[in-house]
Amino acid sequence: LGVKVCEPGERHKESYKSAGLAAAAGGITTIVTRPDTTPAIDSPEALEFVTRRAQADAPVNVLPIAALTKNREGREMTEIGFLMDAGAVAFSDCDHVVENTKVFSRALTYARSCGALVIAHPQDPGLSQGAAATSGKFASLRGLPAVSPMAERMGLDRDIALIEMTGAKYHADQITTARALPALERA
């Protein structure tokens, strides 16, 4: 979930103007943008900057997602309440997994108290480190470093347990394997 706009940081790759024009050309009127920029959208000031830029340059509505943890490093949660006041519609560290269960649990608890949605990439980071694809025929034929589908399942199991504990609103981003479906069906 989310459009990768590279402002601030790497505007030459994708700007609010170019992303907005592409969306409008396809008949899309609203885009939701990710916080994985350089620097990350992890403070009200950074969010206000991108909001002003989007309003000035994008021909479509822009709804920003803010980072769940500072610099998307998984060590310290962001100011979720202040970021919501500044316009964040959800919180995510994108493809970075918040490995520390205590930090993730606290962030989910705080997000629940604010009514915020958390979007996470369920993955066991130890099993998925260095992988470029899910194990299988595609990865084997191309000689790609692969990760077991169980890494996604294990990450999702952890996230579901924390959601049950905290009652937070949660969206699992990038489910790529059927092995994760039993966990989703139970949830």
Located regions from the model:
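Hydrophobic faces of well-ordered beta-strands that scaffold small-molecule active sites
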Residues: L1-V3, I31-T33, V62-A66, A90-D93, ...
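Active-site mouth loops of central-metabolism enzymes
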Residues: L1-E14, P35-T37, L63-E76, R142-M150
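Histidine/acidic residue-rich metal-binding segments in metalloenzymes
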Residues: M77-A187
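Metal-associated gating/positioning segment near the N- to mid-region
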Residues: L1-D57
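Alpha-helix N-cap/helix-start motif
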Residues: G9, A40-S43, E73-E76, N100, ...
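Short coil/turn connectors at secondary-structure junctions
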Residues: L1, G26-T29, D57-V62, D85-A88, ...
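Conserved short loop/turn motifs at secondary-structure junctions
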Residues: P35-A40, A66-T69, D95-V97, A172-T176
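Alpha-helix-loop-beta-strand connector modules within alpha/beta enzyme cores
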Residues: P44-I65, T109-A120
